[in-house]
Amino acid sequence: MAKTIQAIRGMNDCLPTETPVWQWVESKVRSTLASYGYSEIRMPIVENTPLFARAIGEVTDVVSKEMFTFNDRDNESLTLRPEGTAGCVRAGIEHGLLYNQEQRLWYMGPMFRYERPQKGRYRQFHQAGVEVFGIANAEIDAELIILTARLWKELGIEQHVTLQLNSIGSLEARANYRSALVEFLQQYVGLMNEEEKERLLKNPLRILDTKNEALQQALNNAPKLLDYLDDDSREHFARLCAILDNVGISYEINPKLVRGLDYYNKTVFEWVTTALGAQGTICGGGRYDGLVEQLGGHATCGVGFAMGLERLILLVQEVNKAIPLPQSAVDIYLIFAGENTASAAFRLAEKVRSELPHLRTMMHCSGGNFKKQFKRADKSGAKIALVLGESEVQNQQVVVKDLLGGAEQQTVALEAVIDHLKTSFKE
């Protein structure tokens, strides 16, 4: 027997028993974004490697350690996308969507990072992302946060997520803060592991979200980024907080929140939860006003967020016990037997699908006697079985059997079966 081939570690199948909750969550994401007037954009999952190196930052963990990168046959370096913002900006520049325009865009799909697989974090994972271009003021930052808060209500998780906010200011303000932070951290090098020492040299702000408990304690006395903000960033952040206060969105200001990608400036935010054990991020984002120009476009401000669907779905399943999922994949199961019944059965099945498209109709195609077919019908979870034998075909009739309610089966004229089904599924 040949050795079986299995999925790559950290890249998981989504089975038929799992897809209904995915479809429900995805539909809530789509409908919420549509209600705010956002438009879908779809980008390739493979991009030229320099796109991510330039956008995300050479010294970030994502670029230096986590990307799936390979050379194609022309020896060009390509990368499976680790996030969606860079590709969305690239598409916007390439197709002339950004210059002197406002755009509100969203996307959904797989991303790839070479991480150690664990619950809610995989090497192939899925994100829903939103990117807004051409709007500089704090109102759009607020809209994105209000939008996510509405989505949490739609998903039934609003009591289990907390909004954390920070402003990381301009590039100049951040450079000044970086110098002060490095000077402070020098006295704690002895507490750092090798990875943290490397971050101290290359990307010291990333030490602020360390999991090292001793270092976390020391960081309580570290300089605060908010104290180094430029006036424009300070006013922008104050305006955002005022809007959120006025519309009743609760938040915590987290001075250690910096996000893991280099392109952010001013506002950064995360929605976090403790309902899955240790605190985990469900959604994160912020402003990236220099990214479009950095990638070769005209100077255009931007702001966005992304949410990891695997972790979001884990949270939904953990705290929302009233998800309206279908109990089976089938509503009507059509069975038939006899020499000349197949054609009539196909015609009936198509008639039902045409006139009752909201009902899911499955036709038995694997043969066998009626007893065997009824077993399959019961196993399918269908509410109704439609039965055609030679006599029914000859008399233009169909037998309707209630598989769940125990009602007596009825013989119905073929021309009346649609009305009969409408009544059955209204009850």
UniProtKB/Swiss-Prot annotation:
Keyword list, A-Z: Aminoacyl-tRNA synthetase, ATP-binding, Cytoplasm, Ligase, Nucleotide-binding, Protein biosynthesis
Keyword field contains Zinc: no
Reaction equation(s) it catalyzes: tRNA(His) + L-histidine + ATP = L-histidyl-tRNA(His) + AMP + diphosphate + H(+)
InterPro entries: aa-tRNA-synth_II, aa-tRNA-synth_II/BPL/LPL, Anticodon-bd, Anticodon-bd_dom_sf, His-tRNA-ligase, HisRS-like_core, HisRS/HisZ, HisRS_anticodon
GO molecular function, one term: ATP binding
Subcellular location: Cytoplasm
Source species, domain of life: Bacteria
GO cellular component: cytoplasm
Disulfide bridge positions per record: none
Positions in coiled-coil regions: none
Top EC category: ligase
One matching Pfam family: tRNA-synt_His
Gene Ontology biological process terms in this record: histidyl-tRNA aminoacylation
Record carries keyword DNA-binding: no
Enzyme Commission designation: 6.1.1.21
Subunit relationships: Homodimer.
Similarity remark: Belongs to the class-II aminoacyl-tRNA synthetase family.
NCBIfam families documented for this protein: hisS
Protein name from the UniProt record: Histidine--tRNA ligase
Organism encoding this protein: Mannheimia succiniciproducens (strain KCTC 0769BP / MBEL55E)
Gene: hisS
